[in-house]
């Protein structure tokens, strides 16, 4: 079978990592922010891509692609995965009517945790909803960037996330200040982190690194603080490396992190 991957700008590191066997399609106007002009142009671009490939199955992911895609693609060929329903239910509740309206514009809605499925149903989104947990390929640890500065610490605490309020980076920094003998490493920042004042000497924001999950092999503990989640892939990657996990009890996290057993 052939696989076609559609993305917005298509200029990030993840785009370059996609297998050569995958057909890559740009949809330049598919953007995170709301814009009537860009969204209408994205719908037109998605229609052209659909006609070009005539796919048997269309797998849509939240949020923007899930909305526009359900407007464009045939219902019977479309599956929609919700990666963390709290991003709508709590953080952007004004979009809830749109999700309700479009729920029948796909053949199935996939929640990534029982928590999300339960909340989808409680909010009236009940059409062919089921839970399928996220899966991963175990990260390849053969070609990792050296971080010799971490060897001086008793333990290394790793977090992998975008730097945004949802992910509570200030809490990560505050914990680092409390434990100066431990090294704290954050992978995922796109630019220098300056908005939280001077970082403690043991706190390192190292940027957006390809194959980030593989660096769990160089850590002693994985930490993910967050206001809301679906079922974080980074936690699953950390667990695949045998790391204990300290994470906020949000979304489906407690379905995989068992307190006092494999984390806290």
Where do the PLM segments sit?
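Donor nucleotide-sugar binding/catalytic pocket of nucleotide-sugar-dependent glycosyltransferases
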Residues: 25-26, 104-143
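Glycosyltransferase donor-sugar binding loop
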Residues: 5-12, 136, 160-164, 183-195, ...
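Short hydrophobic beta-strand element within catalytic cores of glycosyltransferases
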Residues: 235, 244-247, 257
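Short His-centered aromatic/hydrophobic patch
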Residues: 60-66, 82
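N-terminal strand-loop element at the rim of the active site
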Residues: 1-38, 119-121, 129-131, 190-192
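Aromatic "clamp/platform" in nucleotide-sugar-dependent glycosyltransferases that forms part
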Residues: 208, 227
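Acidic anion/phosphate-binding donor-loop and adjacent secondary structure
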Residues: 34-37, 90, 121-122, 135-153
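A conserved mid-protein helix/loop that constitutes part of the nucleotide-sugar donor-binding site
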Residues: 155, 159-178
């Amino acid at each position: 079978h052939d696989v076609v991957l559609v993305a917005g700008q298509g200029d990030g590191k993840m785009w370059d990592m996609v297998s050569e066997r995958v057909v890559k399609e740009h949809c330049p106007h598919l953007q995170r922010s709301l814009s009537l002009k860009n969204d209408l142009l994205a719908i037109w671009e998605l229609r052209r891509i659909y006609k070009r490939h005539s796919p048997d199955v269309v797998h849509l992911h939240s949020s923007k692609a899930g909305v526009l895609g359900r407007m464009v693609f045939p219902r019977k060929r479309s599956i929609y995965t919700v990666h963390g329903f709290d991003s709508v239910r709590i953080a952007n509740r004004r979009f809830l009517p749109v999700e309700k309206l479009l729920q029948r514009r796909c053949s199935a809605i996939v929640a990534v945790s029982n928590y999300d499925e339960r909340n989808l149903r409680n909010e009236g989104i009940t059409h062919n909803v089921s839970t399928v947990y996220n899966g991963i390929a175990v990260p390849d640890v053969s070609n990792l960037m050296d971080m010799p500065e971490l060897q001086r610490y008793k333990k290394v605490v790793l977090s992998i996330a975008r730097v945004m309020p949802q992910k509570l980076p200030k809490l990560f920094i505050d914990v680092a200040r409390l434990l100066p003998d431990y090294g704290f490493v954050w992978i995922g920042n796109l630019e220098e982190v300056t908005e939280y004042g001077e970082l403690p000497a043991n706190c390192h924001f190292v940027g957006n690194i390809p194959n980030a999950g593989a660096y769990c092999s160089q850590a002693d503990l994985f930490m993910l603080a967050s206001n809301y989640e679906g079922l974080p892939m980074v936690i699953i990657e950390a667990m695949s490396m045998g790391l204990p996990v300290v994470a906020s009890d949000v979304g489906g996290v407690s379905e995989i992190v068992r307190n006092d057993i494999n984390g806290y």
